[in-house]
């Protein structure tokens, strides 16, 4: 990576900067590479906007005393869907007459910029985020990144497209009905649909305000999770923001128990069905137990989103907009909101509550539900002929998710016979985002598909039970985690991140007082233990002694048991240091605790 930006992942950009490249050089080259006639973009950063961000980045690095670990997204370009505010940029929601100049960043954008990320552009969408197709915009339809005759999926069409083509390593979308998942499936990328309220919606143009989610697109699950962990967290300015109770599992068993729909519907699309069935076979190869469940309550709840009073939320969101300026298909949808009464809304809420209870009961005893991301895909011409029917088909396996308060992770599953991608989605109850991502990383490595539409291979990630040759596998739990202050002690010694997983349920985590930077102590206990999030790193044997020599008391290296029964080297703590230390086990890991203390 010398003259033009070609890195596709966060690690690629970070490595470029470690190799001596400058953000100014790489990001100005990227800006010149991007085309204004690309329908995925609504606005691109001007030279002045980019320079202002680069100046702010230089100041942030100076404040960090040159420590890049304090800016985990240092110099990484990203894009946001143009219904999300960025200070100094217009927000259009794909409706020029609605547009306004944003005076402040949306909360998620502010957090990403504070971590060093650089906003390079705002992306196209189905107008007012109403649609799963990517064709309902006055800025043009966004075509599929694999075949220009097909839809890209929506409503976060542009955000998915620019990631799939490797223009940015990550982007933000939104997901109310599936807008952060369907485009991921259609473009061979990852779409992380977080638990409602994890990523705050402050600065988001609402679609259905009570169930809207800001989502993340990336080429890898690891990158999507990193971005979500930075952007997420409670925001008092958002009435729908929630604090993570830290009660959900953060890992998944080696042999998970997964629910799958009985008699899944593909609307005659045998190619999508073939990819899905092959994916189920691969899950079995990975040790998963698959159990069919009745999908009727999921389907019934999905129907409520567009064929019930929830459509009135969309009506409220655009009530100040002249109907003449709204896309005809979108206008037809939002005008339906006037058909429903307050009585209808309460009746629908009772139905939602009953079906949600049935859905969550059905998922009890399972680690996740696995569904096709979309049952089918359509051409642009087909979508023009049947815009509502085919949109409804795309939402078969997505529309129920937010109404039932579930989280989801869309991941690539393979290519169809015609060369188009298809995906699967992992779904679980609220706050199981980390567990889904843990298995999603394992799944992505097992399939080893090319990244998006770039044709480039997935970066090698060591996933075997044994460390790489000449390395010692070490579990880190605190300040050495990715993006934390002491992570450089691993990265500068050529250590390689293997995976995120959890300890066995025999440990408790404590915040050690007076440590700089703040550090936790992990202690094995005889009872009342819990699983704690850890990262596994393979450290070269030749550098292991140097690494251990930098570990101050009361910490040291010992043996640590993982949730799947493996034993690795890991951080331990002298018992004397735990006297009076705060027990933070309920947070599930050090990163969640640190995020809470910063609020």
Please report, for each region that a protein language model flagged, where it lies by residue:
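An N-terminal boundary/leader segment
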Residues: 1-55, 285-287, 452-458
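Acidic/His- and Gly-rich active-site-bordering loop/insert found
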Residues: 50-52, 63-137
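Gly/Ser-rich, acidic/histidine-flanked active-site/gating loops
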Residues: 5, 9, 75, 87, ...
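Glycine-rich, small-residue loops and helix-cap segments
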Residues: 30, 75, 114, 168-169, ...
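Short helix-loop capping/hinge segments that flank enzyme active sites or metal/cofactor-binding pockets
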Residues: 4, 11, 72-95, 253-261, ...
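Short Gly/aromatic-enriched secondary-structure transition segments
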Residues: 43, 93-94, 486-503
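Short glycine/serine-rich loop segments
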Residues: 105-231, 402-425
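A short helix-breaking turn/cap at a secondary-structure junction
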Residues: 193-276, 297, 438-466
């Amino acid at each position: 990576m010398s003259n033009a930006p070609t890195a596709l992942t966060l690690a690629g950009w970070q490595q470029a900067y470690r190799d001596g490249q400058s953000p100014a050089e790489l990001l100005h080259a990227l800006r010149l590479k991007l085309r204004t006639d690309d329908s995925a973009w609504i606005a691109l950063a001007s030279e002045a906007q980019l320079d202002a961000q680069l100046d702010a980045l230089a100041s942030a690095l100076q404040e960090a005393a040159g420590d890049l670990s304090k800016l985990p997204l240092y110099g990484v370009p990203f894009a946001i869907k143009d219904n999300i505010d960025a200070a100094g940029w217009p927000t259009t929601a794909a409706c020029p007459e609605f547009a306004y100049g944003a005076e402040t960043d949306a909360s998620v954008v502010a957090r990403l910029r504070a971590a060093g990320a650089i906003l390079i552009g705002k992306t196209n969408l189905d107008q007012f985020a109403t649609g799963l197709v990517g064709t309902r915009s006055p800025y043009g339809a966004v075509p599929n990144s694999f075949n220009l005759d097909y839809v890209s999926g929506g409503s976060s069409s542009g955000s998915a497209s620019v990631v799939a083509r490797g223009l940015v390593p990550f982007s933000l979308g939104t997901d109310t009905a599936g807008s952060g998942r369907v485009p991921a499936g259609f473009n061979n990328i990852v779409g992380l649909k977080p638990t409602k309220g994890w990523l705050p919606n402050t600065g988001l143009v609402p679609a259905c305000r009570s169930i809207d989610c800001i989502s993340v697109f990336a080429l890898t699950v690891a990158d999507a999770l990193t971005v979500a962990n930075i952007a997420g967290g409670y925001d008092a300015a958002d009435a729908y923001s929630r604090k993570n109770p830290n009660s959900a599992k953060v890992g998944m068993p080696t042999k998970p128990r997964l629910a799958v729909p009985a008699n899944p519907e593909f609307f005659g699309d045998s190619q999508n069905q073939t990819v899905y069935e092959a994916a189920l076979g691969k899950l079995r190869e990975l040790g998963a137990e698959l159990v069919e469940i009745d999908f009727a309550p999921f389907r019934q709840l999905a129907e409520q989103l567009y064929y019930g009073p929830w459509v009135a939320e969309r009506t409220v969101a655009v009530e100040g907009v002249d109907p003449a300026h709204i896309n005809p298909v979108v206008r037809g949808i939002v005008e339906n909101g006037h058909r429903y009464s307050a009585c209808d809304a309460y009746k629908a809420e009772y139905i939602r509550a009953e079906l949600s209870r049935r859905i969550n009961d059905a998922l009890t005893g399972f680690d996740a539900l696995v569904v096709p991301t979309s049952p089918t895909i359509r051409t642009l011409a087909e979508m023009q002929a049947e815009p509502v029917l085919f949109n409804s088909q795309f939402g078969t396996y997505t529309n129920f998710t937010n109404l039932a308060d579930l989280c989801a992770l869309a991941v690539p599953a393979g290519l169809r016979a015609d060369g188009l991608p298809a995906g699967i989605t992992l779904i679980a109850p609220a706050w199981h985002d980390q567990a889904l991502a843990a298995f999603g990383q394992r799944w992505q490595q097992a399939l080893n598909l090319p990244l998006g539409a770039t044709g480039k291979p997935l970066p090698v990630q060591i996933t075997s039970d044994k460390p790489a040759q000449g390395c010692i596998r070490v579990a880190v739990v605190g300040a050495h985690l990715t993006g934390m202050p002491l992570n450089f002690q691993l990265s500068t010694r050529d250590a390689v991140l293997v995976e995120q997983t959890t300890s066995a349920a025999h440990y408790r985590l404590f915040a050690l007082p007076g440590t700089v930077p703040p550090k936790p102590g992990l202690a094995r206990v005889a009872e009342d233990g819990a699983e704690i999030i850890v990262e596994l790193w393979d450290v070269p044997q030749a550098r292991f002694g140097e690494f251990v020599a930098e570990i101050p008391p009361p910490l040291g290296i010992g043996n640590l048991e993982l949730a799947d029964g493996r034993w690795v080297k890991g951080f331990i703590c002298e018992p004397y240091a735990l006297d009076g230390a705060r027990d933070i086990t309920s947070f599930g890991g050090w990163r969640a605790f640190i995020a809470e203390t910063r609020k």
